[in-house]
Amino acid sequence: MDALEKGAVTSGPAPRGRPSRGRPPKLQRSRGAGRGLEKPPHLAALVLARGGSKGIPLKNIKRLAGVPLIGWVLRAALDAGVFQSVWVSTDHDEIENVAKQFGAQVHRRSSETSKDSSTSLDAIVEFLNYHNEVDIVGNIQATSPCLHPTDLQKVAEMIREEGYDSVFSVVRRHQFRWSEIQKGVREVTEPLNLNPAKRPRRQDWDGELYENGSFYFAKRHLIEMGYLQGGKMAYYEMRAEHSVDIDVDIDWPIAEQRVLRFGYFGKEKLKEIKLLVCNIDGCLTNGHIYVSGDQKEIISYDVKDAIGISLLKKSGIEVRLISERACSKQTLSALKLDCKTEVSVSDKLATVDEWRKEMGLCWKEVAYLGNEVSDEECLKRVGLSAVPADACSGAQKAVGYICKCSGGRGAIREFAEHIFLLIEKVNNSCQK
């Protein structure tokens, strides 16, 4: 992270004694429009994602819970519906491609603002220099994957309706702070925010507010003065479970578990999965075919995947297998998975559609695990899709979840666990 992303949010102290800029923003005329037509100030979401991350190489597009890291915040920003434009500022081709796949526009960051010494403010000012239409910038941190559209909607309202010049995100923490011991300077520690003789209980103390770095919104005039926090300021308090930041490797597994339980998965309301269709070759198996001396076909699969299938079935999810290859009856029988299977399939989408109708399901209740070009249409159509880690690039682009495991090496079990977590989210949302 650069200086701002680590919390140094200005190049100097915020202006003091400056008159409050609390007046609602003036409406601006649409450029190129006829007289009398007005529009609100242009609010742009801007995600800074350079390719030279030192903590975790290319972390901005590393898969978190099967989704490129940057994808989580882009999904939230686009679905919030409050931005006139959503941008990613980057100097890297791969990050640019991922950003466009999620529907964001791309600003190619210059080498001058892509250095290790460059600050977020440098990159934001550069962006504004190229985009005169932008009046307000919502700088959203790529490393905050639990961000929800509702957070952004409320902040946009604070800026547009309540007249704030800048709003930044905070989280409430109940942590006692102590001074640092420095040899030759301070030999003992002292409490900074408590009286040890009267230690408060958590429920008796409001705690303190800390910046969590999730986002910084500021008006153009403030940014051009060199600040992201100033003028009429306000904080936006995020829920603790949504306050996640990824900086080093140790943060990754913690963030992954948090995002699976508290992350934003899109506008579509999650439905409980009732049917999982899995491609045999390259998903259930590793795609290798062995031929014995007597010309018999031999394939193998991971016991973990068999257990995953069993767990799915016990939870009430039908599991069916599909293949475009002509697998022999002996081979299918030897699998001993007790799943309905269709082989020699030339049109997988038609077959899955037939199964769906047979079970009286909508597409949102169907999950699909595939790995080949022939699986792409199914992957795009179903409610929940995934591919093994070694799937072809076309299939990877068509899905929302990419397994860490390869085909025939635990991908089904991993996807099953993912399905169970999503079912838990559905049940929790219903209870609420």
From Swiss-Prot:
- Active site (UniProt): 199
Give the E.C. number(s).
Answer: 2.7.7.43
Q: What is the effect of changing residue 196 to A?
A: Does not affect the nuclear localization
Q: Where is the composition biased (Basic residues)?
A: 18-29
Which residues get modified to Omega-N-methylarginine?
35, 50
Q: Which residues carry this modification: N-acetylmethionine?
A: 1
Q: What keywords appear on the UniProt entry?
A: Acetylation, Methylation, Nucleotidyltransferase, Nucleus, Transferase
User: Where does this protein hold substrate?
Assistant: 50, 60, 109, 118, 120, 141
| Pfam families with a match to the protein in the record | CTP_transf_3 (PF02348)
Region ranges (Disordered): 1-38
Q: Name where it's found.
A: Nucleus
Task: State the domain notes.
Answer: The BC2 (basic cluster 2) motif is necessary and sufficient for the nuclear localization and contains the catalytic active site. The localization in the nucleus is however not required for the enzyme activity.
State the function annotated in the UniProt record.
Answer: Catalyzes the activation of N-acetylneuraminic acid (NeuNAc) to cytidine 5'-monophosphate N-acetylneuraminic acid (CMP-NeuNAc), a substrate required for the addition of sialic acid. Has some activity toward NeuNAc, N-glycolylneuraminic acid (Neu5Gc) or 2-keto-3-deoxy-D-glycero-D-galacto-nononic acid (KDN).
PANTHER family to which the protein is assigned, alphabetical: HAD SUPERFAMILY MEMBERS CMAS AND KDSC (PTHR21485), N-ACYLNEURAMINATE CYTIDYLYLTRANSFERASE (PTHR21485:SF3)
What name does the UniProt record give this protein?
N-acylneuraminate cytidylyltransferase
Q: Which organism is it from?
A: Mus musculus
